[in-house]
A protein has these predicted regions:
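Terminal, non-globular segments
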Residues: 1-171
């Protein structure tokens, strides 16, 4: 955690003060909140992950004035993330990994782990924020926001999380 606290604060700052409700090209929302949820340390049957994701979402709800939308989204994503990690990575491998990153998992396995979670985040956000899910505009929003955030997550990991930081916890 010692080496990863600065990138974590940078992501919080970006989400709250810079990228707060910024819409790119009328379809893309960049949300570093997804990156925080993805890179958080996995612990089997951990209530800590749910509590941290709730308060993280609550922090963004305060700044977005969104009445619990981000809290609900973060808790649902954190809950299904724990199930997805066991399904994709396996229980024996998760015990030896401190950080679920591209460096630790490899490119393809990280894509299989991260991209469905990112899609789920934007699907839940879109469903509750816009009120409709299967319109063409919402599907384009979900798809383009997911792709842009995945690219941002990969770039962030290669810039700020090098191989030396893998042994440290992201908590």
């Amino acid at each position: 955690m010692k080496n990863n606290i600065i990138p974590f604060i940078l992501l919080l700052f970006l989400q709250v003060f810079v990228l707060n409700k910024v819409l790119f090209f009328n379809y893309v929302i960049i949300s570093p909140l997804v990156m925080i949820l993805l890179l958080y340390k996995y612990q089997k049957d951990s209530k800590e992950t749910l509590v941290v994701s709730f308060f993280l979402g609550l922090l963004f709800d305060v700044f977005n004035d969104s009445l619990g939308l981000y809290s609900l989204t973060c808790v649902l994503v954190a809950y299904f993330r724990n199930l997805w990690v066991l399904k994709i990575i396996g229980e024996e491998r998760t015990e030896e990994l401190n950080l679920l990153s591209v460096h630790a998992l490899g490119g393809f396995q990280f894509f299989i782990y991260a991209f469905p979670i990112i899609i789920m985040f934007y699907s839940i956000l879109s469903l509750f924020e816009f009120g409709e899910y299967l319109s063409l505009n919402n599907l384009i929003f979900i798809f383009l926001s997911s792709i842009s955030n995945y690219v941002l997550i990969i770039i962030f990991q290669y810039l700020f999380l090098n191989n030396n930081n893998i042994s440290n916890e992201w908590r």
